[in-house]
Structures are given as structure tokens and as C-alpha cells.
Amino acid sequence: MAVGKNKRLTKGGKKGAKKKIVDPFSKKDWYDVKAPAMFNIRNLGKTLVTRTQGTRIASDGLKGRVFEVSLADLQNDEVAFRKFKLITEDVQGKNCLTNFHGMDLTRDKMCSMVKKWQTMIEAHVDVKTTDGYLLRLFCVGFTKKRTNQIRKTSYAQHQQVRQIRKKMMEIMTREVQTNDLKEVVNKLIPDSVGKDIEKACQSIYPLHDVYVRKVKMLKKPKFELGKLMELHGEGGTGTATKATGDDTGAKVERADGYEPPIQETV
């Protein structure tokens, strides 16, 4: 047998000695996720992030996180087929302040609307809000039987489909172009845009199940903390009450553990 160290044996003693198990959750912190003031329920839940260590700052790991929440949870409502995407834009103390990032219909709702003997009409348009957000809106609508109609099918002619699609694009452009993001979200919550399209298209062909089925965020303006604070109900004032999240429209405060962002230049 060759004389020398046995490299396979661990330094501490016996071969295969157990490693010290470290709980990964001991290095992590819980942060509250806060929805903007447009919604009734402000406290969405909690999110987990690794604690600040050296150059790795916890708040940097949280910024840009997207949360998908049902509108039923945001509005304390029974209508649960709309999902809103909210993105973390800033961290104040233990609160993640979010902003609107997109909207979608649930898959089961979309599947339940598609049926035989009717025409499905879809349209999409890219529109810029007054405060510089570029959104892509997708709309969907279905033809329905006229009153006293005996025929089983209710198919629209190609010319009618084109007219309805044009009307959809006009209304979506008008509703978004003349408003800022906050007002657009307030219109998306009850889907007043879909109802307007349904009314406007009655003269061309009667429609039902008209919805803005999806909203995509394409471009955002440069981030401004003041505007985000306004969305969360702080209205530009320096002092505000702490956001508990249990009540509706609560304000967010900079907590004691607030870490200012690191500046690249002094």
C-alpha cells in the first residue's frame, strides 16, 4: 500500500460525514405586494427574496417581478374571468409597489364563448396613452341571432365583419388615446370598452360576448417615483400613512428599513 494521504477521506473525520444542512429560508425575507389605488383590495399577498448580502441588494431582485392576479381577488367580486398582471416598480421598506403590466381573459372563459353557428370577429390595435404608455389591445366579439330569427345560423357577411372590425379599432383607439394609464385601467375593470363596441355595432350586426380579451404593455416611459406614489394614493405629498393592505385605498409609507437606491455617480 502506498504511503500518503487518502484524498477521499474528508478532513473532519469519517468518510461520507454528513454536511451541515442550512435552511435556505433562513437567508430570505418576506415582502408585502401592494396593488395600485385603482383596485379595492390593496394587499395582494407576500413574495420571497434573498436578503441583502454584499453587493446583491434585495430590492433589485424584486424590481421587475410580475404577479398575475384574478380581478375577483383585486375587487372582492364574483366575476373571476379577468386576470391582471402587475409589475413591481419600486420597493419601499417591506412593501413592493406595483403598476399595471397587462390583462388577459382566462382560458376557460375564452373556450366557453367559442361556439358553432356564429361568426367570431377579432381586432387588435397599438395605442399610446396620454402619459406615454404604448399598449396593444386585442378585442373579440361574436354574432348572435336577431330577434324573431328562425334560421339556426347567424353568420355575418365578409363586408359586415370588416365594418365591425373597423368600429372595434376606432373605439379602442379613442378610449385609450384620450386617457392616461390609470383611467384606462379603470375602464378595463368593468370592461366598459366592450359594452361600447357592442352598442355601436348593433346597426351592422347584433353582437354578444364582446370583450377586450387581452392587453399587452409594449413600451413604458422613464420611471418616475412621484407618478408611482400617485398611483398608490400618495398624491405627491412627503408624509403618508402606512399601507396596511386590509383596508381599501390605504396609503404606502417609507418604512424604517427603507434602503435608497445606489447611485452610479455622485
From Swiss-Prot:
This is Small ribosomal subunit protein eS1. The lineage of its organism: Eukaryota, Metazoa, Chordata, Craniata, Vertebrata. Its main location: cytoplasm. It holds the Pfam family Ribosomal_S3Ae. HAMAP family: Ribosomal_eS1_euk. One of its GO terms (cellular component) is small-subunit processome. It comes from the Eukaryota. PANTHER family: 40S RIBOSOMAL PROTEIN S3A (PTHR11830). Component of the small ribosomal subunit. Mature ribosomes consist of a small (40S) and a large (60S) subunit. The 40S subunit contains about 33 different proteins and 1 molecule of RNA (18S). The 60S subunit contains about 49 different proteins and 3 molecules of RNA (28S, 5.8S and 5S). Part of the small subunit (SSU) processome, composed of more than 70 proteins and the RNA chaperone small nucleolar RNA (snoRNA) U3. It is found in: Cytoplasm; Nucleus; Nucleus, Nucleolus. Keywords: Cytoplasm, Nucleus, Ribonucleoprotein, Ribosomal protein. The gene is rps3a. Coiled coil: none annotated. It comes from Solea senegalensis (Senegalese sole). One of its GO terms (biological process) is translation. Belongs to the eukaryotic ribosomal protein eS1 family.
